[in-house]
């Protein structure tokens, strides 16, 4: 039975329990149910009794006079009396007789009257309300104007008190009176939108087809336009044709809810329309207008849109709709008969300046709610940062959300107790435990000392809490632009907070930081550093990516590694790099894997490898490795990314690349030169070799890529070949990694200069660059070290020194051997300058 109770009926039962507790009664009788019905205040029962002059205080005094108060407040569950149970059973019977499939407050009141012998009935009679008269009043309210059967409310149906309950019962159940809410000051102020509100008024004032539909993207303020109209009606700022109108918003969900049988939904909607037609002063607002299409339609039934069409065409029903562009196109435009009955009113996204004005108008509401002060700079930051960095939502909604969450964040921080209060709690708990242990051990002297210590700690804690509450809580917290930026950073992962002195210094020293992992390549490091500084200072073109580069040059000189180092510098993690191997996209049809498959193709729901990653990480470094191996169609798709900073994926969503750094690596034009030039250890002529290689690379790039692609790239950087000194520095980096691994085993590693030079000789190939160096170190150093550790020739606490035998520093040293000797570890072993960086970064620093 209770599953049929409406929310209000359930609330009546809860209130009846509360009334029983207040009177110290250990049961719930009919009198408590009557008190609950009146206390609920909004249902049909409460309105019926109120119209008969029955008040809560009057009933309560009569109950106390008849029964009196109990001696002791009951604890636990309070049971119903048999008579109260009978009333609830009778309420079900009354509902069925009226043809209702729910039990509301009106049915419970009718059950009380039908029972007729309980304390509740006696109280009503004493207060001058004859039971038959009460019943008639309930039936009259249920029947409305025409005296027909009650409008079904459906479980969870909404209602609210209004000035004339008998004439707006159905609308109150299925909607909300916006003009009443505006009169009570419950609606947020509407800033701007005068043109849209005026256009809505014009359409509403037409003779026929006077139904505007607000069309716009989600979050631009379509509902706010309707709320602005409601406020204009209340303030009398409307033409004569709209004065004294009541604006109701219709809840289609409550209309459909509980309509179990065919015809239930249509009957409810007809009653709503009949009430609107009878009153003649109602304007209906239907949010999410597209839900009308198909709403309530079942086998043999017609949907809500078909029921409304005749009235909309004749001007008998004034309706304001609101829906998004996509939903309007998908649902409304397909139904031409429905579309022509509505006049579209476009609601565009406000500008940043307009959004700031909107935020200023809403400031008081959010300050009162969060108990904070919101500065002007916070509102400017919310509008500008939201517009720039949140691209899948619209102003002013996203800016308002930033302000709201920043206020909530500040309030939560202020309401959280400081750490020293928790420390006091822990100390007090420890003192109590020690005191109890001392008492158990009958060490009463120690227990007395601990008791005094506990009292002292409690007093200190109370004083500290008083300081916190009187100091921190009395001062109104301030939400400024930094708070807004922090919230945005949490949302998007974009570090848009103000440049601190530490961050500024780090950016100015960016080249130095990158060179901890990248050996040489001054041109490339400078170009990338300038692009990042330009972005962080806010001077880059807001429509283009933060930077776009082609890294060209021989294999194994650090092109990919620089991309990883950049991602590590920005995010502290190499995994922040979005790396795409373009060798996987050499066929025409594989381009769909990158940007998302079109509808009807395999993988449509999964999205593209590039677009999905950038949507989730809008502030990232994107590396297109070996771009020359990709199909030509992919270059065409990337033109829009390079120029406008955006790309449409297979599902029609716009992906934003404005906060990404795009890096393309290429080996074009370097293979022949690498073979001819070799390592380039001789300093003389190395610059000429580089210029020849650079010219060759540029020529090859122009042959392979279209001019419109190369023209959109910020910079083409040709990497230098590595010199002997740079190769030795790379040895330091890689050996530093091995040394750090040995540190975990309490061992240290040291290489002689001759050993480093021999590793550089054996580990560098003029064609493959520095990549073979990793394999050389693995073969010559790591393999032998691992054997010696397993044979226990080297153990914890030792310093392993690596030297070379049989090589005088000349030639390739084919017969030379590396020697390993173990000795006591020094207190502070001097590590190579760059060893730490090698451990922090990728294992093969300086290589791709």
From Swiss-Prot:
Phenotype upon gene inactivation: Depletion experiments (using anti-sense RNA) stops degradation of anti-sigma-E factor RseA.
Positions that bind ATP: 553-560, 617-626
Stored Gene3D superfamilies: 1.10.8.60, Clp, N-terminal domain, P-loop containing nucleotide triphosphate hydrolases, UVR domain
Domain UVR: 425-460
Entry keyword Repeat: yes
Keywords in alphabetical order: ATP-binding, Chaperone, Nucleotide-binding, Repeat
GO (cellular component) term, any one: cytoplasm
Cystine bridges: none
Stretches assigned to the Clp R domain: 2-144
Biased composition regions of type Low complexity, renumbered to the chain: 835-848
Pfam families referenced in this protein's UniProt entry, alphabetically: AAA, AAA_2, AAA_lid_9, Clp_N, ClpB_D2-small
Recorded superkingdom: Bacteria
Biological processes per GO annotation: cellular response to heat
Segments of this protein annotated with the region Repeat 2: 80-144
MF (Gene Ontology): ATP binding; ATP hydrolysis activity
Annotated stretches, region: Repeat 1: 5-70
Membership in a protein family: Belongs to the ClpA/ClpB family. ClpC subfamily.
Purpose: ATP-dependent specificity component of the Clp protease. It directs the protease to specific substrates. Can perform chaperone functions in the absence of ClpP. Degrades anti-sigma-E factor RseA in the presence of ClpP2.
Designated name of the protein: ATP-dependent Clp protease ATP-binding subunit ClpC1
Organism: Mycolicibacterium smegmatis (strain ATCC 700084 / mc(2)155) (Mycobacterium smegmatis)
Encoding gene per record: clpC1
């Amino acid at each position: 039975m209770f599953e049929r109770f409406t929310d209000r009926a359930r609330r009546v039962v809860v209130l009846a329990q509360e009334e029983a507790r207040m009177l110290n009664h250990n049961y719930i009788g009919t009198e408590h149910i009557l008190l609950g019905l009146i206390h609920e205040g909004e249902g049909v029962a409460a309105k019926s009794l109120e119209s008969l002059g029955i008040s809560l205080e009057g009933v309560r005094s009569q109950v106390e006079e008849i029964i009196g108060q109990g001696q002791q407040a009951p604890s636990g569950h309070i049971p119903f009396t048999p008579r109260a149970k009978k009333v609830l059973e009778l309420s079900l019977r009354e509902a069925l007789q009226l043809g209702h499939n729910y039990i509301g407050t009106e049915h419970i009141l009718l059950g009380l009257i039908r029972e007729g012998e309980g304390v509740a009935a006696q109280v009503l009679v004493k207060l001058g309300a004859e039971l038959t008269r009460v019943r008639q009043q309930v039936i009259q309210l249920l029947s409305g104007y025409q005296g027909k059967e009650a409008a079904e409310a459906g479980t969870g149906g909404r209602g609210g008190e209004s000035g004339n309950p008998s004439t707006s019962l159905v609308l109150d159940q299925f909607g909300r009176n916006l003009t009443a809410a505006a009169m009570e000051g419950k609606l947020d102020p509407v800033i701007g939108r005068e043109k849209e509100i005026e256009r809505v008024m014009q359409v509403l004032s037409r003779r026929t087809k006077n139904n505007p539909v607000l069309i716009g993207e989600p979050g631009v303020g379509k509902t706010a336009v309707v709320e602005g109209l409601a406020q204009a009606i209340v303030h009398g700022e409307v033409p004569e044709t709209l004065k004294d109108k009541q604006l109701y918003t219709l809840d289609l969900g409550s209309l459909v809810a509980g309509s179990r049988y065919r015809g239930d939904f249509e009957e409810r909607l007809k009653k709503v329309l009949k009430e609107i037609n009878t009153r003649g002063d109602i304007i209906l607002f239907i949010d999410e207008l597209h839900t009308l299409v198909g709403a309530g339609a079942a086998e043999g039934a017609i949907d809500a849109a078909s029921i409304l069409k005749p009235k909309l065409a004749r001007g008998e029903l004034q309706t304001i709709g609101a829906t998004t562009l996509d939903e309007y196109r998908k649902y409304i435009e397909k139904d031409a008969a429905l579309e022509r009955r509505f006049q579209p009113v476009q609601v565009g996204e406000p500008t940043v300046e307009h959004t700031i004005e909107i935020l200023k108008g809403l400031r008081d509401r959010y300050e009162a709610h969060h108990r904070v002060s919101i500065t002007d700079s916070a509102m400017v930051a919310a509008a500008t940062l939201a517009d720039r960095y949140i691209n899948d939502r619209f102003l002013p909604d996203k800016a308002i959300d930033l302000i709201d969450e920043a206020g909530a964040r500040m309030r939560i921080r202020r309401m959280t107790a400081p750490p020293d209060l928790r420390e006091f709690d822990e100390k007090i708990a420890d003192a109590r435990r020690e005191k109890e242990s001392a008492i158990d051990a009958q060490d009463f002297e120690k227990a007395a000392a601990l008791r005094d210590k506990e009292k002292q700690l409690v007093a200190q804690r109370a004083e500290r809490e008083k300081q916190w509450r009187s100091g921190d809580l009395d001062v109104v917290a301030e939400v400024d632009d930094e708070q807004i930026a922090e919230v945005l950073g949490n949302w998007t992962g974009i570090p848009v907070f103000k440049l601190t002195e530490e961050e500024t210094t780090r950016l100015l020293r960016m080249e130095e930081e990158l060179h901890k992992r990248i050996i040489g390549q001054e041109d490339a490091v400078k170009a990338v550093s300038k692009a990042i500084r330009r972005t962080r200072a806010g001077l880059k073109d807001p429509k283009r990516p933060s930077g776009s580069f082609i890294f060209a040059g021989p294999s194994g000189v650090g092109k990919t590694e620089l991309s990883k180092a950049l991602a590590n510098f920005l995010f502290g993690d190499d995994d922040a790099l979005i790396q795409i191997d373009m060798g996987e996209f050499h066929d025409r049809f594989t381009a769909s894997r990158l940007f998302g498959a079109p509808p009807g193709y395999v993988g449509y729901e999964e999205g593209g490898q590039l677009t999905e990653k950038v949507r989730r990480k809008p502030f990232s470094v994107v590396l297109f490795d070996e771009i020359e191996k990709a199909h030509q169609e992919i270059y065409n798709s990337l033109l829009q990314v390079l120029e406008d900073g955006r790309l449409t994926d297979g599902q029609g969503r716009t992906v934003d690349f404005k906060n990404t750094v795009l890096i393309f690596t290429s080996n074009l034009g370097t293979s022949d030169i690498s073979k001819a030039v070799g390592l380039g250890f001789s300093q003389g002529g190395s610059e000429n070799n580089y210029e020849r290689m650079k010219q060759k690379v540029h020529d090859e790039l122009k042959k392979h890529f279209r001019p419109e692609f190369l023209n959109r790239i910020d910079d083409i950087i040709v990497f230098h070949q590595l010199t002997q000194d740079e190769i030795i520095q790379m040895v330091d980096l890689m050996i530093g990694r091995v040394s750090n691994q040995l540190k975990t085993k309490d061992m240290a590693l040291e290489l002689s200069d001759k050993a480093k030079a021999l590793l550089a000789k054996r580990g560098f190939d003029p064609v493959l660059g520095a990549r073979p160096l990793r394999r050389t170190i693995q073969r010559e150093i790591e393999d032998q070290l691992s054997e010696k550790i397993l044979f226990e020739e080297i153990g914890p606490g030792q310093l392993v020194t690596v030297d070379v035998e049989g090589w005088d520093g000349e030639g390739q040293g084919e017969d030379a051997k590396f020697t390993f000797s173990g000795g006591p570890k020094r207190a502070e072993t001097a590590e190579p300058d760059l060893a730490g960086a090698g451990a922090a970064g990728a294992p093969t620093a300086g290589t791709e």
